[in-house]
Amino acid sequence: MPHSDELDAGDVLAVENLNIAFMQEQQKIAAVRNLSFSLQRGETLAIVGESGSGKSVTALALMRLLEQAGGLVQCDKMLLQRRSREVIELSEQSAAQMRHVRGADMAMIFQEPMTSLNPVFTVGEQIAESIRLHQNASREEAMVEAKRMLDQVRIPEAQTILSRYPHQLSGGMRQRVMIAMALSCRPAVLIADEPTTALDVTIQAQILQLIKVLQKEMSMGVIFITHDMGVVAEIADRVLVMYQGEAVETGSVEQIFHAPQHPYTRALLAAVPQLGAMKGLDYPRRFPLISLEHPAKQEPPIEQKTVVDGEPVLRVRNLVTRFPLRSGLLNRVTREVHAVEKVSFDLWPGETLSLVGESGSGKSTTGRALLRLVESQGGEIIFNGQRIDTLSPGKLQALRRDIQFIFQDPYASLDPRQTIGDSILEPLRVHGLLPGKEAAARVAWLLERVGLLPEHAWRYPHEFSGGQRQRICIARALALNPKVIIADEAVSALDVSIRGQIINLLLDLQRDFGIAYLFISHDMAVVERISHRVAVMYLGQIVEIGPRRAVFENPQHPYTRKLLAAVPVAEPSRQRPQRVLLSDDLPSNIHLRGEEVAAVSLQCVGPGHYVAQPQSEYAFMRR
């Protein structure tokens, strides 16, 4: 039934008194309470808040996707103006009617494109399916339109990408495919749920710019769900702040940033890591934590020196890691991915060395190669005077007691069939270190050390939040008293308060136990906060390395400056240079088998500060 007289002029969406609840052990648990908002055509509304505040379930309720998950949705009004300008009440639509609304009139970009795209269908088939369903196009017409959409989201070689599967694309490319699919039918409303959270800063900047360009072209209303206040400042017209299922403040982006009224909004803004906030400070600094009772305040810097003088605990020289690519009728290796090329660095006890760079720069492969989780083709890895790269499997297992790994996705790295107590105990059992009672006491101590309760040992991973699962992974990494921890994007997908808690925990553990961290991240503001030294990687090579202050306050390499310039700043009035939408993620690091890449030559430009020389820099950046 039409409701055209109930929408205010210019509005494309209006929600009044939305309530969402879930049944848990025969109890109704409220997720969202009395939420009301509107969205105008061509406007971007940012919905912000921490994990569990109700942002994503609100989006799913608008898309009518909560019913299958057992959600209980009640709303006085949920009106949408379709592309045809007809106004409908979403809550009154049948499942069959909603199939025609989703995609055509209201589309959604999900946070994780790998789980949102079907792995058994090509990219072209998935985009074309939506076009055929909503536009009554033939298969040939749908594929032509799918290619046009890939061109529109600046994907290079779109015709080739149409025939590829999701796993064959990078994270940034998959996210752009999701955007192309969502926009393929020119919807009236686009809901973007954390579309850039786990992406590196340059790809994030491209996607934000892309959404703004396409929004202007299509006069779309956009609901942008995020916990990143820098992104909010860059893209939003209005902001809705949610806390524990309720809207606590709403207003223009300038009002929210310059005159926040609610204590939670003020605490949220104060807790945002600001690039440049560490200027003039030599040592890492703890994050302020969010609290309604005590608004976030700056923690003092860690003044004591944690780095121990003497020999480095880890020494890497000319590390080379390549992956074969097979092709042809005989499936021979014809090309190789040069993931890591002649990388060298030292890591001292009590030091945090951060590896930064875009997706595909070789950061994670470097970390995995140090533990021989991937095999390297050259170079030396020396831990406490002993070469890791030549050890037998038995001796390597013993050495892994001293080097532990924290993975990006804690849920994927915990066995869902094991209690977390068993997961933490497993390294102790493998190395035969502690008998039963002592091991149980050790687990209880570790859980308390990472801010959890000893009785949590009997629970399973799915019973914890993302931040709690990451704490469990840290507890497991600490079980063997390691000397080195490799943290691979350990906080990239966590919201600002949980991220602050985890970083503070890592700093406390470093102070107490002298642990050295190799911190792999694309979040430059976090890297600035936690690091003693920083190494910048590009196409598998280190192009700049030095003390954190030198790299951040006086970056010498153009790629380092590019990374820093791409970081969103939580200041909406700041004038930003117009970005050029790049046509690809990174130049290719795929070469013919046997082809050697010129090693970058580093030049000293300050105490401990080394930068790629211009001539060698050109040799690899031109590819």
From Swiss-Prot:
Keywords: ATP-binding, Cell inner membrane, Cell membrane, Hydrolase, Membrane, Nucleotide-binding, Repeat, Translocase, Transport
Family: Belongs to the ABC transporter superfamily. Glutathione importer (TC 3.A.1.5.11) family.
Subunit structure: The complex is composed of two ATP-binding proteins (GsiA), two transmembrane proteins (GsiC and GsiD) and a solute-binding protein (GsiB).
Record field: catalytic activity: glutathione(out) + ATP + H2O = glutathione(in) + ADP + phosphate + H(+)
Sequence ranges assigned to domain ABC transporter in this UniProt record: 15-269, 314-564
Database matches in NCBIfam families: PRK10261.1, PRK10419.1, PRK11308.1
Protein name listed in UniProt: Glutathione import ATP-binding protein GsiA
Function according to Swiss-Prot or TrEMBL: Part of the ABC transporter complex GsiABCD involved in glutathione import. Responsible for energy coupling to the transport system.
EC number(s) recorded for this UniProt protein: 7.4.2.10
Species per Swiss-Prot/TrEMBL record: Escherichia coli O6:K15:H31 (strain 536 / UPEC)
Places the protein is found: Cell inner membrane
Any Pfam family: ABC_tran
Keyword hit for Signal: no
Positions bound to ATP: 49-56, 357-364
Main location group: membrane
Membrane topology: Peripheral membrane protein
Organism ancestry: Bacteria, Pseudomonadati, Pseudomonadota, Gammaproteobacteria, Enterobacterales
Gene from which the chain derives: gsiA
